[in-house]
Amino acid sequence: MFEFLVTTSKGLDELLAQEITKLCPQLSVKTKPGQVLFTGEIEQAYKICLWSRLANRVMLKLADGHVDSADDVYQITSSVNWTSHFSVNSTFVVDFVGASHCINNSQFGALKIKDAVVDQFNELFESRPSVSKIEPDIRIQGRMWSDKLTVYLDLSGSSLHQRHYRTKTGLAPVKEHIACAMLVRSGWANDQQAPLVDPMCGAGTIAIEAALMAANIAPALKRERWGFTRWLQHDATLWQSLLDDANAQIITPNCVISASDIDHGVVSIAKENADAAGVFSGIKFNTIDACKVIPPKGHTKGYIVSNPPYGERLSEITALLPLFQAWGTSLKEHFKGWNLSLLTSNRDLLRSMKMFAHKEYKLMNGKLECQLVNFALDEKNCITRETSLSNNDFANRLNKNIKRLSKWLKSENTNCYRIYDADLPEYNVAIDRYGDWLVVQEYAAPKNVPEAKAKRRLHEVIVALPQVVDVPAEQIVMKVRAQQKGKSQYEKVSQKQKMLEVFENGAKFKLNLTDYLDTGLFLDHRVTRQLVQQRVKDKDVLNLFAYTGSVSVHAALGKAKSVTTVDMSNTYVDWAKENFALNKLKGPYEFIQADCLTWLERHNNQYDFIFIDPPSFSNSKRMDTTWDVQRDHVALLRNAVKCLRPGGEIMFSNNLRQFKLDEEGVSQLGLTIQDITQKTLPEDFKRNPKIHGCWVLTLNA
């Protein structure tokens, strides 16, 4: 008798234990999270390797012992007679799982086991087997738990979930053993006469695994490489008899399996995979929107089992929430009486379908914590719940804002403006319109607001927006804006490269809606930029902390004599150049990449007009010191005055809400102060008077 360990994903151990007991009724099994242990014969281990649809690995225990030091790992491994398991001409690899007080690195643990194996061969044969990470003949695994090491021979080789029919995948594929677990948990595995539908099939894994079940095809029947193939104690005759028996048990299925996806390319991949698995004829494939899928003809009951998109990224939720809501409505209309099982890592998406869950199971899909949620599409769940926006406070306020702004917009020459700015505290977002796109910025919720509640409110916003503003869900960009805490205000948030051209008062600007926290244009400074354009004719202009150069563009359009644009970021300096090119501006325009503070200290040129809109805080690696606008603004203005001609103006602005201008310190620089904050607030920012402060500081002649 031998001791074996069979592994699977966490959450599937009880299912795996049931499967093993069914395959080998005489076995007594013990479960641990993600593991099933049993004592038995090699034949039973072979049978599990061949037939288990839920296992990842089947491993034979070779040795174990308590570990107080790294040398104990070596000694425990050395107690195994490795020459009885594989020859010096074989290749091998060592995996190591777990850690202890003396082995806290898996590579180090694997190395100690490898050294013990190699040293044993060298001592006996003055030669050693080679290590190969690519298709090794023998795979050894060390597992450390609570200072106890167990050394195993992995009979599986590669993980058993790899059925070797999947040559290509779609996005976020579900692993084969997870697909089988879904089929079991859904109830279909024990009710295969009922039809099975996967309306978001991706690479087809769920449908293919179902077809393999229906035909009683052993999942590993086509596997060619095993961890025991070159094992010296392998019983080839026994193994061949198990293969022959498995081939004899294949049946012609009598069930309906339907798989579809909206993506034709993905459906083609699913067909190729089904063909490779030998079950193409047992699955009906179709290219169709999930919301348009209807039951197979003549079937009023059945199972829908699917792995829909999870929406791991915030930006994806804007498109997925309306999709799930519409899909839920479609399911209630067309699939009444059916059972629905969905795998997700985002339970909130399923809540938007407005159905009550019958059962939920936690499991791991790879490294992702997921839930398999079962719904019964019965009378209770098929009631169409109210989705009207007529009683939605957010939708009503948004409609009110749009109506109010519509009159103002007729006199404005822009297609980018704010339509909502946390008007209702419970809907704590800002919404900006850029042409046919919306950018939704979620402000960090107060600590006293539960995260689940804040998320629910955000989802209400996302669902309402396409209906109220008439913008497609896929053209809504989501961002999260937390309060600044000592870091630069410009942050990368994704890598989607959604570029857009907008216009404002005769100027054009290139924006990036997705790659940074800010888009490239500060909408609250729309009036400020107009004022700059009106004040700079025939003047030498300096724009510090210039960002993407929008103020510089307006200065050039205002016929400034020269415009110098300075920013610390190469990205933004290049962006500013592109904005100038977009407006066909050519002339004495200089673009400088530099730390504005250091550059200003060393610069001697004279200007008639200087625009300064620094960040509130910054600790960029490119800066020698930290920056705090409240603490440092007088020192900044002192250096700016050195570059200002008598009678010249500094337009100074910042967006620190509690900022207080040091009037005494500024006056001592010879500057006359004029607060123009109220004058620079656009209509769409009137309800947020502290969005920025703005002053014109004139140098006394």
UniProtKB/Swiss-Prot annotation:
Q: What is its main location?
A: cytoplasm
Q: Which reaction does it catalyse?
A: guanosine(2445) in 23S rRNA + S-adenosyl-L-methionine = N(2)-methylguanosine(2445) in 23S rRNA + S-adenosyl-L-homocysteine + H(+); guanosine(2069) in 23S rRNA + S-adenosyl-L-methionine = N(2)-methylguanosine(2069) in 23S rRNA + S-adenosyl-L-homocysteine + H(+)
Molecular functions (GO terms): 23S rRNA (guanine(2445)-N(2))-methyltransferase activity; RNA binding; rRNA (guanine-N7-)-methyltransferase activity
Subcellular location(s) of the protein? Cytoplasm
Q: Which Pfam families would you find in this protein's record?
A: Methyltrans_SAM, RlmL_1st, THUMP, UPF0020
What GO CC annotations are associated with the protein?
cytoplasm
Enzyme Commission code(s) on record: 2.1.1.173, 2.1.1.264
Tell me which PROSITE patterns the record gives: THUMP (PS51165)
Instruction: Indicate the segments forming the THUMP domain, all copies.
Output: 44-155
Which keywords does the record carry? Cytoplasm, Methyltransferase, RNA-binding, rRNA processing, S-adenosyl-L-methionine, Transferase
Leader sequence segment: none
- Role description: Specifically methylates the guanine in position 2445 (m2G2445) and the guanine in position 2069 (m7G2069) of 23S rRNA.
| Family the UniProt entry places it in | Belongs to the methyltransferase superfamily. RlmKL family.
Q: Which HAMAP family does the record match to this protein?
A: 23SrRNA_methyltr_KL
Q: Which named protein is this?
A: Ribosomal RNA large subunit methyltransferase K/L
Q: Which organism is it from?
A: Pseudoalteromonas atlantica (strain T6c / ATCC BAA-1087)
